[in-house]
Amino acid sequence: MEIENHTLITKFLILGLSDDPELQPILFGLFLSMYLVTLLGNLLIILAVSSDSHLHKPMYFLLSNLSFIDICFISTTIPKMLVNMQSQIKDISYIECLTQVFFFNIFAGMDNFLLTLMAYDRFVAICHPLNYTVIMNPRLCALLILMFWIIMFWVSLIHVLLMNELNFSRGTEIPHFFCELAQVLKVSNSDNHVNNVFMYVVTSLLGVIPMTGILMSYSQIFSSLFRMSSTVSKYKAFSTCGSHLCVVTLFYGSGFGVYFSSSVVHSTQRRKVASLMYTVISPMLNPFIYTLRNKDVKGALGKLFNRVASSPSCINDIRNKLLLRSVRQIL
């Protein structure tokens, strides 16, 4: 097969989840439903946190940011997959692939950082409650999130610039449902040693460091829980951490599963399933996990629904509050 320079490559072939034509309508309906549920669930959390003054706390500020990132995360991959399923065309342009790699890495990294920051927030709230408002002040949270955005922007940009130097064959097939960086590197025809080294170093750092922070936070939290004499206090403290633990387990478990399965089990289908867990299932379930046992969020959602049902001007009020909150954060 003739090797073409990357500047002449105009498209890749995304093999998707299945080659069976009869399954395409079923998969299309399934993933469209999951995508819409994810958008609705996470948007409701953002609106609930923004519209209720009782939720203007660091914990819920981080939760609303996580919901925004989850919307962006799933929107990086699923819409293109749905278009390909509907049109029965598996093409993705070279520019689209680079763009998908760029934004996918940004949002995956932001998910990582936010989960770590949320674990630290829970640690401060339980282990240092008297200093909570001093340590977890809104300005610090906003600065940390901005710093994470800057870090992930440059990391993703370097990934894309290195990938842009690779050569690919005409008609290259990517055995995945989106342009995952590791899969794109595997199908290149040029020396990708630098790309692989950078990818594994970044993946290790972005996986090990945040995970270490989460483990250290929860080790201190559990130590404090064991020292509590009141059962009610233990239950209340654990209930604030249970949802976050579920999300962390789902995200990191499936994320690490992708890389372990890539190196140990050479099964493309298993790798796709593992990728689905943290790219689709995790963003979809997060709103349900966080609201299932959270009375404050459920109460805010109830008030939001009541206001929408009773007042036609409610949407304008919410929009104005969102704009006002954005201006305050900038200032």
Swiss-Prot record:
Coiled coil: none
Residues with glycosylation annotation: 5, 167
Keywords of the record: Cell membrane, Disulfide bond, G-protein coupled receptor, Glycoprotein, Membrane, Olfaction, Receptor, Sensory transduction, Transducer, Transmembrane, Transmembrane helix
GO biological process: G protein-coupled receptor signaling pathway; sensory perception of smell
Cellular component annotations (GO), alphabetically ordered: membrane; plasma membrane
Keyword presence, Transcription: no
Family annotation (Pfam families): 7tm_4
GO MF annotation terms: G protein-coupled receptor activity; olfactory receptor activity
Location in the cell: Cell membrane
Annotated TM spans: 26-46, 58-78, 98-118, 143-163, 197-217, 245-265, 272-292
Residue intervals on the Extracellular side: 1-25, 79-97, 164-196, 266-271
Presence of keyword Disulfide bond: yes
Disulfide bonds: 97-179
Topology with respect to the bilayer: Multi-pass membrane protein
Cytoplasmic-side positions: 47-57, 119-142, 218-244, 293-331
InterPro entries assigned: GPCR_Rhodpsn, GPCR_Rhodpsn_7TM, Olfact_rcpt
Family membership noted in the UniProt record: Belongs to the G-protein coupled receptor 1 family.
Purpose: Possible olfactory or taste receptor.
PANTHER family linked: OLFACTORY RECEPTOR
Protein's name according to its UniProt entry: Olfactory receptor 7D11
Organism annotation: Mus musculus
Gene: Or7d11
